[in-house]
Amino acid sequence: MKGVSALQLSRDVGVNYRTAFVLIHKLRKALLEHRDNTLLSEEIDMDGAYVHPAPRKANKKVDRIDYRLKENQHPDKRCIIVAREHFSAGEKAVNRFHRGAKRSQVFVTYSETQSVVGSIAERCIQKAGRINTDESVAYDVLLPTYDLRTVNHKEEYRSDSGVTNNQAESFFSRFKRMYYGQLHKINNQ
C-alpha cells in the first residue's frame, strides 16, 4: 500500500477535506512523539538513496551540462539513509508473522559519506550489531566497531553466505512508490 491522501480519506470516512487533512497530521504527530528510539540490535540492514535528483537532460548533446559537478547539482538533493532491524530467530519461532523488518530508523542527510554513516550508526545501533550493507565506501567506517557484511549489487543481490540488505531496499521501494505515486513532491523539512 502506498498511503492514503487526505482527499481519499475524506471520501472513505465521509468528512470534508480539511477534517481529513487535520486528522492525518495529528496522526503523524502522534506517531512521531511515540516512536521507539531505543538502539537497534542484532541484525540490521543499512542503505542510502537520493531524492530530488538532477533534472532531465537536454535533448541536444551540446546543450547538456555535467550534473556531477557541484555547481550544476539540484540544490534540494538529499540522501535518505535507513537502518532496519530484523526480527530475531527467537521472535520468528514464537510468531510466524514476524518476518521482514522489526523497526526502522530513517535519517535525511546531504550525502552518504563515512562521517555521516558513522554518526548515524553511533546514535542508533548497538556496538554488537551485525550490519548488512552494499559495497559503498561510506560504510567502511563501521568495520572496526561492528560486524559489517557487504553484498556487491553489481554481481548479486544476495551473497553466497546469505548476506543481503533487502530490508533496506524494500523500504526504498515503498518510499519511492509513495514519493512518485502519492505525494508527487516532498519538501526537505
Predicted regions and their residues:
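Residue-level recognition of single "structural anchor" positions
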Residues: 1-189
